[in-house]
Amino acid sequence: KRAIQSEKRRQHNASRRSMTRTYLKKVIAAIASGDKAAAVAAFATAQPIMDRMATKGLIHKNKAARHKSRLS
């Protein structure tokens, strides 16, 4: 039972981590393209997701803070 739960949790966490990375890539791509409006919008959607992942323990809170600080 423990192994099954572990595997299920691992897959769930992997999908969440992937989603977080995707949002970060969208922000970076918007900044690189020079489109300020798109960059601001992408950052606004990525920010609460980073906070949520930090709260749930998927990423460290300092890592979330570092990403937000560097992207803002």
From Swiss-Prot:
This is Small ribosomal subunit protein bS20. Binds directly to 16S ribosomal RNA. The keyword Flavoprotein does not apply. One of its GO terms (cellular component) is cytosol. Pfam families: Ribosomal_S20p (PF01649). InterPro entries: Ribosomal_bS20 (IPR002583), Ribosomal_bS20_sf (IPR036510). GO terms for biological process: translation. Belongs to the bacterial ribosomal protein bS20 family. It comes from the Bacteria. GO terms for molecular function: small ribosomal subunit rRNA binding; structural constituent of ribosome. It comes from Aeromonas salmonicida. Keywords: Ribonucleoprotein, Ribosomal protein, RNA-binding, rRNA-binding.
